[in-house]
Amino acid sequence: MKTMYLALVALVTLAACADTSGGYNPAGFEGGSGWNDNEISAEDLNDPTSQAYFENSVGNTVLFDVDGFTLNSSAKVALDIQAEWLLSNPGYVIVLEGHADERGTREYNLALGFRRAQSVQEYLVARGVSGLRLKTRSYGKERPVEICSSERCYEKNRRTVTILSQSLS
C-alpha cells in the first residue's frame, strides 16, 4: 500500500510540472517554426517579407518518396514558389534541414537526410537563389514530426524543411 501511495504522489508531482504552453512543434511542418508557435502575430502573418508569412503562406516543407532524394513534381512546384519568395527577399540566410523516417540505421538516415537537403539546395540554386545564402543540415530520423508505425507517419517524416535562420538586412 505504501508503494502505491508513493507512486501516486510521484505521478501527481510530475503532472503538476507539465508545461502546457504550446510545447515544441518541429520546425517546418504544417507551419511549425519551432518553440511556441502560438506567439506568431497576425501582423507577422500578413507581412509578406516575414518568416511567419513564408512558413504559413509560401510553405517551407517538401516531402520525398521512400528511400529517395529525387524531387517529385509537387516538390518542384513548392520549391518554385519558395525560390520566387527567396529571390524577392534576399536578406535571409536559409538552412535546409533534411529528415528521414525511422526506418533504417541512424547513419544511413543522416546520409539520406543530407542528400535530400542537397537536392533542394541544387534546385533552389538552379532557380537563381545564391548558394552563399544556403546551408544544409541533416537530422536523419532524430527529429520526427510524428512517431508511429504507419506509412502516413513515415511519409510526413521524409522531408526537407526550409528554415529562414536570420535576416541579413
Question: What would you call each of these model-derived segments?
Answer:
Residues 2-9:
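Sec-dependent signal peptide recognition
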Residues 152-156:
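A generic structural micro-feature
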Residues 74, 78-81, 107, 115-119, ...:
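Extracytoplasmic/secreted proteins, especially bacterial periplasmic and envelope-associated proteins
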Residues 91-99, 114-145, 158-169:
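A non-catalytic structural micro-motif
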Residues 13-16:
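C-terminal motif of bacterial Sec signal peptides marking the signal peptidase cleavage site
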Residues 146-150:
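Short beta-alpha junctions and helix-cap segments that line functional grooves
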Residues 18-93, 166-169:
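Periplasmic peptidoglycan-binding/tethering modules of Gram-negative envelope proteins
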